[in-house]
C-alpha cells in the first residue's frame, strides 16, 4: 500500500506538469493561428479574433484554476514570438492571464454550467465571460502602449476597442466549441448526415461568396446560422459562426468585398460588428433551443412517470397484494 501511495504521489506532479504544458501549447498554437490575420489601426496591430482567450477560459472551466500557470506560460510564449522581452511586456502578460481567471471566477459565481443547457448560461458567457472580463486585458494592453509612447493618446480608444472585441470574440466562439467537444455526439441517422452535409455545402459556397462580394450581402449568412442552430444546436451554429467570422476576417485584412474602399477604422468597426452579432446570435439562439429541448424532455419524462403511477393506482400494485 505504501508503494502505491508513493507511486501516486510521484504520478500527480508529472500529470500536473503534463497538463500545464498541454494548456500552454494549446494557448500558443491558438495564438499563432490568431496572428495569421491582423488589422492595423494607428500603427497598433491587433487581431479581430483572439482564440487564446477562448482556449484559456475553456481550460479554466474544465480543469479549474490549477491550469493558470499553463495559461501564463502560453501567453509568455506568444509574446516572445512577436517581440523581445522587457519589463513592460509583463503588464500585458498579467492582463492576458488575469482576464480569463476573472471570467472563470465570475462564471462560477453565477452557477455557470459547461453544458450551456440554459439561456442564463449563454447570457453569463456573453456578458461576464466575454464582455466584462476582457476589459482587463484590453485596458492593460492599450494602456501600456500609451504609457510607453508606442501609441498616441488620441488613438487609445480605437485600439482599446479593437483589442477588447478581439479578446471577447475568442471567448464567444472558441470557448463554447471546446466545452461542447467533450459531449457532442455525431448523428447516426443517415438523414441527419445528409442534412449536415447539405448545410455544410451551403455554408461552404455562400459564406465565401458574400464575404468577398463588393455588394453588401453579409445578411445572407443569418438564415444558414438559424438553420444550423435549429437542427444541430451549438455544434452547428458555433461552427457556422466560426467559419463566417474567419472568412469575414480574411476579407477585411485583404480589404476586399464589403470591406473595400474603407479606412482602417471603418474596416475594424464593420468587421467587429459583424463578428460580434454573428457570435451573439449563434450562442443565444442555440442556448434557447437547447433549454426548450431540455424542458420538453423533462415534461415528457414527468408525464411518463405520472402515467406509470396512475397505472399502479388503477390496477393495483402486485407487491402490496393488490388485485385488478
Outline where the language-model segments fall:
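Short helix-perturbing small/polar motifs within transmembrane alpha-helices
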Residues: 1-48, 54-150, 175-243, 250-292
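Cytosolic, intrinsically disordered low-complexity tails and loops
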Residues: 310-324
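Heptad-repeat alpha-helical coiled-coil signal-transmission segments
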Residues: 285-288, 292-299, 303-306, 310-313
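Juxtamembrane helix-entry segments on the extracytoplasmic side of multipass membrane proteins
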Residues: 153-157
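Alpha-helical transmembrane segments that form the membrane-embedded catalytic/substrate-binding core
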Residues: 158, 162-174
Amino acid at each position: 500500500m505504501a508503494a502505491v501511495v508513493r507511486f501516486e504521489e510521484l504520478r500527480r506532479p508529472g500529470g500536473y506538469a503534463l497538463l500545464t504544458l498541454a494548456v500552454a501549447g494549446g494557448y500558443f498554437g491558438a495564438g499563432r493561428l490568431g496572428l495569421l490575420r491582423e488589422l492595423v489601426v494607428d500603427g497598433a496591430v491587433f487581431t479581430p479574433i483572439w482564440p487564446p482567450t477562448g482556449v484559456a477560459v475553456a481550460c479554466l472551466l474544465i480543469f479549474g484554476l490549477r491550469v493558470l500557470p499553463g495559461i501564463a506560460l502560453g501567453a509568455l510564449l506568444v509574446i516572445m514570438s512577436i517581440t523581445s522581452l522587457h519589463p513592460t511586456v509583463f503588464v500585458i502578460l498579467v492582463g492576458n492571464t488575469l482576464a480569463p481567471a476573472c471570467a472563470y471566477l465570475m462564471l462560477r459565481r453565477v452557477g455557470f454550467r459547461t453544458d450551456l443547457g440554459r439561456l442564463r448560461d449563454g447570457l453569463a458567457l456573453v456578458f461576464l465571460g466575454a464582455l466584462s472580463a476582457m476589459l482587463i486585458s484590453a485596458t492593460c494592453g492599450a494602456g501600456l502602449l500609451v504609457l510607453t509612447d508606442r501609441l498616441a493618446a488620441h488613438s487609445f480608444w480605437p485600439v482599446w476597442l479593437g483589442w477588447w472585441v478581439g479578446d471577447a470574440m475568442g471567448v464567444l466562439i472558441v470557448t463554447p466549441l471546446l466545452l461542447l467537444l467533450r459531449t457532442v455526439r455525431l448523428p447516426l441517422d443517415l438523414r441527419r448526415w445528409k442534412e449536415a452535409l447539405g448545410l455544410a455545402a451551403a455554408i461552404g459556397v455562400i459564406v465565401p461568396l458574400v464575404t468577398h462580394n463588393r455588394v453588401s450581402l453579409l445578411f445572407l449568412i443569418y438564415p444558414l446560422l438559424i438553420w444550423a442552430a435549429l437542427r444541430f444546436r451549438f455544434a452547428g451554429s458555433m461552427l457556422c459562426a466560426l467559419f463566417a467570422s474567419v472568412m469575414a476576417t480574411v476579407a477585411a485584412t485583404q480589404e476586399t468585398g464589403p470591406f473595400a474602399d474603407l479606412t482602417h477604422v471603418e474596416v475594424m468597426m464593420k468587421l467587429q460588428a459583424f463578428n460580434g452579432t454573428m457570435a451573439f446570435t449563434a450562442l443565444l439562439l442555440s442556448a434557447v433551443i437547447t433549454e426548450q429541448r431540455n424542458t420538453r424532455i423533462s415534461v415528457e419524462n414527468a408525464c411518463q412517470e405520472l402515467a406509470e403511477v396512475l397505472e399502479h393506482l388503477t390496477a393495483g400494485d402486485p407487491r402490496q397484494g393488490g388485485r385488478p
